[in-house]
A protein has these predicted regions:
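Short, glycine-rich, amphipathic interfacial segments at transmembrane boundaries or analogous
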Residues: 6-7, 67-120, 179-197
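Transmembrane helix boundary and interhelical loop/hinge segments in multi-pass membrane proteins
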Residues: 62-63, 120-122
């Protein structure tokens, strides 16, 4: 974050207090109500989808757990366990750490962008799940539990905090979302700094209208099969 950006972030603090810290009760009530209703329907759909994923894993000999559970940063910086369908090989984290330690091209790409294009760790079934965004369906459980919301900032990893700079203190004022501004602005096709900026702007300016627009754009992005989250 350069000097000008830092000053702008500081100047926006009063706006943050109005729109985030002291959120209107109606916004919180409506948003949580929609979260609960949508997550119940999502969990109902999760049952047949899970059966299909199990069958696909069996026929592609993709051994290992069907779900992937990972700690993410939630509201107020609290950690929570986020659920997804497993889309990578079982030892994906070990492979990534090895690339980072050995400073390979893959490791360097991850350090810079916090993601890997054409990630070799993704399984055949995983590619399908990511392309269709079905890998995110288990997160409806997180939404129902209150760890996440339908719309919000990205659920960042603990190891990403050191690179979030001042943005961190603003982004964690809100629950992470199943979808959000990053997903509709090119999905995974934007770099880490841009994702932080988009999430920061969302937290500062969020509203029910903006949430609705993001949901509609997310549905459109899924059907267009734009870059996976």
């Amino acid at each position: 974050m350069d000097g000008n950006t830092y000053e702008r972030v500081k100047e926006d603090y009063d706006k943050l207090k109005d729109n985030v810290v002291a959120e209107k009760k109606m916004y919180k009530f409506v948003k949580r109500t929609v979260d609960i209703i949508a997550s119940i329907f999502g969990i109902i759909l999760l049952v047949p989808i899970t059966i299909i994923v199990c069958i696909l894993n069996f026929f592609t000999q993709n051994k290992g757990p069907i779900f992937f559970v990972q700690e993410r940063i939630g509201k107020d910086g609290n950690l929570f366990k986020m659920y997804k369908f497993r889309t990578m090989v079982i030892n994906a984290e070990e492979i990534l750490n090895r690339h980072i330690e050995e400073k390979t091209d893959i490791g360097k790409e991850y350090i810079k962008n916090k993601k890997i294009s054409n990630d070799p760790r993704i399984t055949k079934v995983g590619k399908f799940l990511r392309r269709t965004s079905l890998d995110e369906f288990p997160q409806f459980i997180n939404v129902l539990k209150g760890d996440m919301s339908l719309v919000g900032p990205r659920p960042y990893l603990l190891r990403e905090v050191k690179d979030m700079n001042e943005y961190y203190y603003y982004i964690v004022k809100d629950k992470p979302g199943l979808t959000g501004p990053c997903q509709v602005a090119g999905r995974s096709n934007i770099d880490f700094e841009e994702r932080l900026e988009l999430d920061y702007k969302y937290v500062i300016n969020k509203s029910l209208k903006k949430d609705f627009i993001i949901l509609m754009k997310t549905i459109a992005a899924v059907f267009k099969k734009e870059g996976a989250i």
